[in-house]
């Protein structure tokens, strides 16, 4: 394969989604698309990375880190449903449209709504999970509170008690990361550097809230829905947002973070860290 062809294929990219049997909507979790047409979309835009068998072993997969998704397993990292459940069509559509920042998965916003739904329907034929399971129910997202200095302070305490084992000081340098971590596909992974102001999927405090609540499927990133209250997760989200140049992170919010005392200077988060 020539260098030009490889570059071209990388630009075309690959999808990270999933969807229902080759007869369009057959199956419990199927999207309202045509799987036959979706296969044609897949072969044009996705096969270079995700492979002819949708196994993540396309011609340019070797240059991709993380590796392209193997759709046959029915595991999708980014979902608005709780950990372990299949994603909604809207979840998959978001990944197709926006891509995954910092990876080889580019945005496919130029695809029509029908093309996106069709390719989702095709990918849902590639895993038996879609024939027996429906998508998970999206987590409830309460209205975002106005961040305050007190909330950001509490957010750091909660972060240190619940997140620092992997994320460390926010740069992904926690003790678990130092030891080495792997995902469900056996690939080495590192926790996100939250000071960069953007994650693969997350852009806003609302996105951070969803990821903290739902976790990331196929990785050691757990859900916190049974551990923290919605109020506490918002506090963590605003603290993380204050760490870097996240979308809608205001100068005031960043000042709150800058004014925090050094780690360990105050009382650590105690029993109320865990949802009662």
PLM feature spans:
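Short sequence/structural segments immediately N-terminal
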Residues: 32-43, 55, 85, 102, ...
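Periodic glycine anchor positions in long extracellular repeat architectures
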Residues: 51-56, 99, 168-172, 215
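Conserved catalytic-core motifs of eukaryotic protein kinase domains, centered on the activation segment
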Residues: 53, 59-61, 176-178
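Sequence/structural segment immediately N-terminal to covalent heme-attachment motifs in c-type
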Residues: 32-51, 147-172, 179-183, 236
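Bacterial N-terminal signal peptides
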Residues: 7-18
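N-terminal secretory signal peptides that target proteins for export/translocation
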Residues: 1-4
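Extracytoplasmic electron-transfer domains, predominantly the class I c-type cytochrome c fold
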Residues: 62-110, 116-123, 180-245
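Electrostatic cytochrome c docking/interface patches
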Residues: 22-41, 130-159, 247-256, 265-275
């Amino acid at each position: 394969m020539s260098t030009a062809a490889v570059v071209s294929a990388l630009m075309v990219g690959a999808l990270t989604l999933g969807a229902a049997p080759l007869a369009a909507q057959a199956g419990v979790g199927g999207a309202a698309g045509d799987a036959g047409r979706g296969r044609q979309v897949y072969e044009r835009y996705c096969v270079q990375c995700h492979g002819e068998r949708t196994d993540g072993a396309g011609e340019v997969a070797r240059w991709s880190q993380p590796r392209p998704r193997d759709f046959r397993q029915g595991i999708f990292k980014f979902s608005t449903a709780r950990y372990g459940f299949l994603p909604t069509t809207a979840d998959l559509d978001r990944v197709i449209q926006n891509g995954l920042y910092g990876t080889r998965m580019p945005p496919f916003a130029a695809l029509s709504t029908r093309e996106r739904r069709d390719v989702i329907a095709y990918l849902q034929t590639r895993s038996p999970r879609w024939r027996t399971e429906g998508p998970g129910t999206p987590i409830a997202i309460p209205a975002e509170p106005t961040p305050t200095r007190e909330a950001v302070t509490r957010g750091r305490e909660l972060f240190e008690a619940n997140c620092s084992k992997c994320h460390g000081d926010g740069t992904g340098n926690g003790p678990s990361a130092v030891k080495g971590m792997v995902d469900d596909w056996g690939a080495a992974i590192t926790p996100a550097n939250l000071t960069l102001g953007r994650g693969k999927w997350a852009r806003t405090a609302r996105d951070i809230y969803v990821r903290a609540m739902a976790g990331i499927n196929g990785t050691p990133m757990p859900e916190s829905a049974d551990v923290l209250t919605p109020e506490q997760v918002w506090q963590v989200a605003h603290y993380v947002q204050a760490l870097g140049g996240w979308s809608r992170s205001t100068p005031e919010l960043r000042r709150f973070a800058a004014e925090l005392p050094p780690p360990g200077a105050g009382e650590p988060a105690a029993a109320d860290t865990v949802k009662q």
